[in-house]
């Protein structure tokens, strides 16, 4: 699978990420021009977590983000559908669980906060995944989605599209272990809803107080929400 227009098969998605796992962190830093570190910091700050909180880091990949979340003093678990990604991060000392975002292996109301970064695009049924995140979050608990989005400035959006569709694939061929995965990345970003569209999906999944904030000119957006009380 390389085109975002194809139906997402969960096992094909997992296999694609297994194939890029070995050089995933380096590739992300290179292709994002170092912005990935900034995006992780902002995601952690938006969650507002601390000691005593239980946090699910979904689509955690190699658990780089989970380690940074755990620095807050919260208990954090990394979950990902790609066993290869989790294995590539085995040196990182946080709990790791392999699981499908639409069928999470956790009990109801297990977490105070849930976050997913750059993974919701790859979930076969986005709303079902968001509903499952709500199921495992306690009432009043928090959600933060960090995902690629739509630049707000038209001129910048044009430059970004050129980078996404032309420069990024060339750079991926130089540094990535599976360049086709980054062709899929570019196409999946183009097919993804804008900030308001994603907010509507989050609300449709039962979350409340949905709001968003743009990062890097709207290349990325942080959507935050709260699970309503019973």
UniProtKB/Swiss-Prot annotation:
The organism's place on the tree of life at top rank: Bacteria
UniProt-annotated binding residues for S-adenosyl-L-methionine: 62, 80, 100-101, 117
EC code(s) of this entry: 2.1.1.163
A Pfam family recorded for this sequence: Ubie_methyltran
Biological process, per Gene Ontology: menaquinone biosynthetic process; methylation
Known catalytic reactions: a 2-demethylmenaquinol + S-adenosyl-L-methionine = a menaquinol + S-adenosyl-L-homocysteine + H(+)
Protein's UniProt name: Demethylmenaquinone methyltransferase
Organism for this UniProt entry: Mycobacterium sp. (strain KMS)
Gene of this entry: menG
